[in-house]
Amino acid sequence: MNDLSCPAIAFPFFLDPVIIRLGPIALHWYGLGYVVGILFAWWYAQKLLKKHSLWNTNHPPMDKEKIGDFVVWSAISVVVGGRLGQVLVWDLAYYFNHPSAIIAVWDGGMSFHGGFIGIIIAMIWFARKNNINIRAMFDIVAAGAPIGIGIVRICNFINQELWGNITTLPWAICFPLDPYYLPRHPSQLYEAFMEGFLLFIILFIIIFAFKALKRPGTVAGTFMIGYAIARSISEVYRAPQEDPEWFSTLFHSTGFTYGMALSLPMLFFGIYLLLQAFKHKSTENGHPKRKN
């Protein structure tokens, strides 16, 4: 705990990253956040698959029972991909010197972009194995993903990681783990709102008001573009992380961050999916409708 006093303009942080301790076992908010996010995405996907009118020709691309089979694979892919991304992309030197810390996922340290790549691989594998249109599979998973992202960002806040730049705004937060104990932007909460709850509302609207699931790839494309934009905005308020040396050399003092760079492929892939979704006027769960 920092002994310095929090300035009057800011709120002192007081949340415990651990929900409850039972002897040597501790339940962390961070781990619970991932569980709740995945369970919500599972529940929401089942609801979408049951509502046949949302899909082209009133026929969902898969049975709702199938999404239950995918839950385990999605959880594994997100955790493994997220952790590997954190280790290899952000903190390789630290984990090289502290290899035992690699498995300590409950302490935080998960790369969103690594988890994204992990679940993309899992979705492609699962879709091909079960003869499901890949773009429709992307849509189903993307529809509920923002809620999980929002919850995990709140857990980042509770874990006192990824805090923001110094600010004099009235909602500034003093984090005890900050060695300078200065008032900072609660950038994790900005991300929770933009990448999570706002993006979910946008996807909800295009699904139910504009029937976006009838054009496979529309929901996933919108999600990827929306996340890339939201992440880039939030990077402005995040405290700088230690970027790879080659990146710092190329983009020193430009304001272009490594997080922004990692979001660019998502932006381009999202645009590609939208172009593919609107390439054909009539589609049947991702395949051009055949003429008789």
UniProtKB/Swiss-Prot annotation:
Its main location: membrane. GO terms for molecular function: phosphatidylglycerol-prolipoprotein diacylglyceryl transferase activity. It is found in: Cell inner membrane. It is a multi-pass membrane protein. The chain crosses the membrane at residues 25-45, 70-90, 101-121, 138-158, 193-213, 255-275. One of its GO terms (biological process) is lipoprotein biosynthetic process. A 1,2-diacyl-sn-glycero-3-phospho-(1'-sn-glycerol) binds at residue 153. Its EC number is 2.5.1.145. One of its GO terms (cellular component) is plasma membrane. HAMAP family: Lgt (MF_01147). Belongs to the Lgt family. This is Phosphatidylglycerol--prolipoprotein diacylglyceryl transferase. It comes from Bartonella quintana (strain Toulouse) (Rochalimaea quintana).
